[in-house]
Amino acid sequence: MSRIKLFFATCALLSCSLHSFAQIDKNKIFNPVTTSVTSQSVAPDARAGGMGDVGAATDPDVASQYWNVAKYPFTISRAGVSLNYTPWLRKLVSDMNLAYLVGYYRIGEHSAVSTSLRYFSLGEVQTNYNSTGQGAALTVNPYEMSFDAGYSLMLSEKFSIGTAVRFIYSDLKADYTDDVTPGSAFAADLGAYYQDYVNIGQRECQLGLGLNISNIGSKISFGGDNNSYFIPTNLRLGASLMVPI
């Protein structure tokens, strides 16, 4: 009798052990982070893109809104406007592109306001069905866009900070119902920039240090989808040294 009890007790312990192992193994299942509106990570200007997507600490220019909004008080010009157009993956598709309009204005000698509008077109996409899963095929023109406004302030002759608020909108379908709607999100950028001049030999060089955290904000969700997706938050930390030739 005692052997039978011992047998059942052993089976019960093994069952508990296997159940615990199954729970632990389930928790270790690969669970990647899903990110939406990844077009926010595409470099909008040729200068930074040509240097390998650097811009947190480079010399301030009109496109600093995307890379580090805190750089604007150090710009030489009081105001600036730029329009950029970038064909995207042109060797694969012919109609994907990024358009970027940005501008800034320095208020006095120590602060600046800035704004930008970003539009990313994914071109024409052929679908098999409409949003209800039935009917004829549709031609979809999905796009993602964002609008932001920023303010930057020089705290000393060598250091400045800045922030920007952003509205992000993603329209990936051709037609919508009450349960299926475009996605939207709000985000903010925080930046800091340090600029000084150092002597290296007989040359006076410009040293720059920059920190920028972009797209700190809410997740984005689409109507009818129970899931919400992260937006691409990025941390940029850089240093630059301009040496006159």
What are these regions (language model features)?
Residues 1-35:
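Cleavable N-terminal export/targeting peptides
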Residues 23-245:
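Subset of outer-membrane beta-barrel
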